[in-house]
């Protein structure tokens, strides 16, 4: 069995936000700019995703799947413009969900899978 490497662990919440497993990297709980506009929260989440990918030598181009969690599914309308700007045509597959978040100011979060090879 290949080694599973937990790159970033959050002891408070008892989870790993970056895991390398085989040829894949799993990145969770990318969220930022709490209380700001949906565009700022989407960009902030992508910034966090980018930082976490850089921890394992990857970029946004290596992302193959994204789960996008929205407090209000109508905010999905803001996502394409930000993705076009940030992913420059190299888009991952994605799924959008609604979620109740733990704090009122959170409107968006990303979980992602990236490919290493």
Each model region followed by its residue ranges:
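N-terminal presequence-like segments and the immediate start of the first folded domain
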Residues: 1-64, 70-117
């Amino acid at each position: 069995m290949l080694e599973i490497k937990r790159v970033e662990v959050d002891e408070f919440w008892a989870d790993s936000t970056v895991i390398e497993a085989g040829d894949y990297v799993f990145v969770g709980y990318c969220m930022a700019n709490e209380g700001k506009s949906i565009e700022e929260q989407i960009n902030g989440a992508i910034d966090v995703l980018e930082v976490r990918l850089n921890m394992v030598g990857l970029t946004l181009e290596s992302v193959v799947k994204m789960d996008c969690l929205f407090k209000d599914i109508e905010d999905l309308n803001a996502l394409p413009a930000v993705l076009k700007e940030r992913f420059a045509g190299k888009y991952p597959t994605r799924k959008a969900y609604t979620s109740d978040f733990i704090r009122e100011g959170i409107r968006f979060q990303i979980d992602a899978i990236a490919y290493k090879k």
